[in-house]
């Protein structure tokens, strides 16, 4: 009897040992993935992403223009009031795309005028605008010009105001009805048959560029543009206080901007 009891006890101990083994194994399986996942989360390195410049959506700007009739008040440009004037004899040798850093431009406007912004900058620098780089203009250039007066200007004279619905289409890239009207009269008319063609070319060139979403020094801006825009890699660019200049030949290939 004692022998039977000992044997039975031994069997019970073995069963308990086996049960304990499988219980511990199951717990280990259920718990082990968690540290691995956590480790993966900790060691994963996020890839750098290109952040495009911030801007109000084009459709929002167009809707705003339609709802606000004051956007299109007194936007015509009078040639006789222009301080530089007309030059119909200068040749068109190449083109310069002038881009403006809107936050910098608006800071200067506010420093100069405070809350009494001139009508030409009210739309661009309004309190609800979040624009980055915008198109100042696309300028036909004379390669032999010695001053700004030597470039083509007002080649078709003092033109009438453009239709409001046409201007509204391009406020997202050139945020000002007077800006658009003036650039067409002063510059676009010297190389394009219509304002529609002129603005469409501006939009095409602007859309082909990647632009930084922050203010950079001149050299930093040039490096950034060449790094993110292969077509600019070997080109000489131009810049002023808040503007960037990119030049194109008459076949719309990027070329060096003149240093003078």
Describe the role of every protein-language-model region.
Residues 1-36:
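Sec-dependent N-terminal signal peptides
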Residues 12, 94, 126, 176-177, ...:
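Intrinsically disordered, low-complexity regions enriched in Ser/Pro/Gly/Gln/His and often acidic
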Residues 16, 162-260:
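C-terminal, well-folded lobe of enzymatic/effector domains
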Residues 27-29, 109, 147, 178, ...:
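Amphipathic alpha-helical interaction segments
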Residues 29, 37-40, 51, 134-137, ...:
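Intrinsically disordered, low-complexity regions enriched for glutamine and histidine
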Residues 33-37, 42-112:
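N-terminal module-boundary/linker segments of secreted carbohydrate-active enzymes
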Residues 76-173:
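Betabetaalpha-Me/HNH-type nuclease active-site subdomain
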């Amino acid at each position: 009897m004692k022998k039977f009891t000992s044997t039975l006890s031994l069997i019970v101990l073995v069963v308990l040992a086996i049960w304990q083994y499988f219980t511990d194994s199951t717990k280990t399986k259920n718990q082990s993935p968690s540290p691995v996942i956590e480790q993966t989360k900790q060691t994963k390195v996020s890839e750098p992403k290109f952040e495009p410049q911030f801007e109000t959506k084009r459709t929002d700007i167009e809707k705003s223009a339609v709802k606000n009739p004051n956007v299109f008040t007194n936007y015509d440009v009078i040639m006789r009031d222009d301080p530089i004037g007309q030059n119909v004899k200068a040749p068109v040798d190449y083109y310069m795309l002038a881009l403006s850093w809107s936050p910098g431009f608006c800071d200067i406007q506010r420093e100069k005028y405070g809350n009494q912004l001139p009508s030409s900058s009210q739309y661009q620098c309004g309190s609800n605008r979040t624009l980055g780089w915008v198109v100042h203009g696309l300028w036909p250039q004379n390669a032999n010009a010695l001053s700004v007066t030597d470039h083509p200007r007002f080649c078709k004279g003092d033109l009438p105001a453009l239709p409001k619905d046409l201007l509204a289409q391009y406020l997202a890239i050139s945020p000002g009805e007077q800006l658009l009207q003036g650039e067409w009269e002063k510059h676009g008319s010297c190389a394009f048959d219509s304002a529609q063609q002129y603005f469409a070319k501006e939009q095409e060139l602007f859309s082909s560029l990647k632009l930084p979403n922050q203010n950079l020094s001149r050299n930093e801006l040039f490096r950034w543009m060449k790094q993110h825009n292969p077509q600019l890699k070997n080109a000489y660019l131009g810049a002023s206080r808040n503007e960037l200049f990119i030049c194109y030949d008459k076949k719309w290939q990027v070329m060096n901007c003149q240093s003078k």
